[in-house]
A protein has these predicted regions:
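Short alpha-helix
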Residues: 158-177, 183
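A conserved beta-strand element that flanks and buttresses the S-adenosyl-L-methionine
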Residues: 93
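Conserved alpha-helix/loop element of class I SAM-dependent methyltransferases that forms part
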Residues: 1-17
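Conserved class I S-adenosyl-L-methionine
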Residues: 17-25, 120-149
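Class I SAM-dependent methyltransferase SAM/SAH-binding core
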Residues: 30, 34-80
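A short glycine-rich, Lys/Arg-flanked "PGG" loop and its adjoining helix->strand segment in the class I
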Residues: 105-120
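A C-terminal cap/extension of S-adenosyl-L-methionine-dependent methyltransferases
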Residues: 182-234
Length: 234
């Protein structure tokens, strides 16, 4: 997904411009730190105190120049209007968050308001149109059948959470003046690969290239476990 995000940024903003980035639900800060290393000014918003602690510890190991470009705040994505003025950011990330938000539309509208005109909204969501794929490919055919009629699933933490449909999000983004500009599939072939699986460098590069190509290509991207959507503020 980092390749796709970098591609969207490079295609939308002048080379060398220091962007104002808001990472909502930043988790351990992986994307926030990566973008700060690339020269951008990054604000991370995280509601989980433990994840925020881990992100702060990771930030503390970075060189001073990078630390100065990162601000970490405890808070929820629904609270962006409390912390920031409208139009404060060029890029807003919301990756792996919407599945935990029962009614995501108001939050998405708030995120769109944070963008300056022409700004980029990057979402990573679970693909509700492909929930049958994981259980079906692991032989749990009963669960696969049930998934066709559901927009919820049980995640790796054992929590029942939401998934989103592409068409519904397309309509939502249009309605909040950040229409869909591009979308990709994530984890087309690797959704059942165990977290932490280590591969030789050459094999890892092949996997990343395969996933990147599949995530841009129909019909593969439509059955990906996750969707990466990029909206642009009008």
């Amino acid at each position: 997904m980092a390749r796709q995000l970098d591609e969207q940024i490079a295609g939308r903003f002048p080379v060398g411009q220091r962007l104002r980035v808001l990472d909502v639900g930043m988790g351990r800060g992986v994307q926030a730190l990566r973008l700060a290393r690339a020269g951008h000014s990054v604000t991370g918003l995280e509601s989980d105190a433990e994840l925020l602690r881990v992100a702060r510890e990771a930030l503390a190991t970075e060189p001073e120049g990078i630390r100065e470009r990162v601000k970490l705040i405890e808070g929820h994505g629904r609270e962006t209007g409390v912390h920031f003025l409208p139009g404060s950011f060029d890029v807003v990330l919301c990756h792996g968050v919407l599945m935990y938000v029962e009614e995501p539309d108001p939050m998405l509208a708030g995120l769109a308001r944070m963008l300056a005109p022409g700004g980029l909204l990057s979402l990573l969501v679970r693909n509700a149109d492909a929930l049958a794929m994981r259980p079906g490919l692991t032989g749990d055919f009963g669960a696969a059948l049930e998934a066709f009629d559901s927009a919820t699933y049980t995640n790796d933490l054992g929590l029942t959470v939401r998934a989103d449909r592409l068409d519904a999000l397309r309509a939502t983004l249009a309605g909040i003046a950040a229409p869909l500009h591009a979308w990709y599939g994530i984890r087309v072939f690797t959704d059942n690969t165990a977290d932490g699986t280590e591969l030789p460098a050459d094999e890892l590069e092949r996997v990343l290239t395969l996933e990147d190509r599949a995530g841009r290509t129909d019909p593969y991207r439509g059955v990906a476990a996750l969707l990466h959507l990029c909206g642009v503020r009008g």
